[in-house]
Amino acid sequence: MRKKRSAPQKPKLTYRVNEQIRVPEVRVVFKDGSQEILKTGEARKMAEQEGLDLIEVQPTAQPPVCKMDNYGKLQYKLDKNEKDRKKKSKPTELKELRFHPNTDTHDFDFKSAHLEEFLRKGNRVRATIVFLGRSIIYKDKGFELVERLKERLSNVSNPEGEAKFEGKRLFIYFEPDKKKIEIFERQLAKMKPEEKP
């Protein structure tokens, strides 16, 4: 059995600090926003006296730009920001439900309610209308079903383009719309339990 290769990791963003900075002079940006070009050794001593580290933040500038800060705290803040960014950029999953051109009202309501739930959770959805055997001659029923789906899901999503045929299957994708979902959730919260869909 083969082992799966893991995706290459991005190199962690690191800065040169204190003795790692080996250029004759640097531009130091102070906490108040003022700047001054100093000899590297002199800037290092100033940072040491304040109990801080000299951190090179723009190594490509001429001379390189440094700031005085606590390196541990800076690294912690960067790691925290990276984690927050990863949380926010959670990849959306694609959920799919299948219909038939002769799907009855109860099945349509049941399946479209599931699609709506997936969209409210932030997932993309694909509705597939499967034409079995000779039912392909009823393409118009498939397109009617797509229009019903568009109408049913319009309060939480936007269709991605038009419905497309691929063999004996008709596909349409829906993308969640955060603003519409927020409005829908507020309306649901105002409803009495017996009025909720």
Curated annotation (Swiss-Prot):
Single GO MF descriptor: ribosome binding
Q: Which GO terms describe its biological process?
A: ribosome disassembly
Function text: IF-3 binds to the 30S ribosomal subunit and shifts the equilibrium between 70S ribosomes and their 50S and 30S subunits in favor of the free subunits, thus enhancing the availability of 30S subunits on which protein synthesis initiation begins.
The protein, known as: Translation initiation factor IF-3
Top-rank taxon of the source lineage equals: Bacteria
The scientific name of the source species is: Prosthecochloris aestuarii (strain DSM 271 / SK 413)
The protein's matches in HAMAP family, at most eight in alphabetical order, are given as:
IF_3 (MF_00080)
Return the similarity comment.
Belongs to the IF-3 family.
Subcellular locations according to the entry: Cytoplasm
* Gene Ontology cellular-component terms listed: cytoplasm
Q: Which key words are in the record?
A: Cytoplasm, Initiation factor, Protein biosynthesis
Q: Could you give the subunit structure recorded for this chain?
A: Monomer.
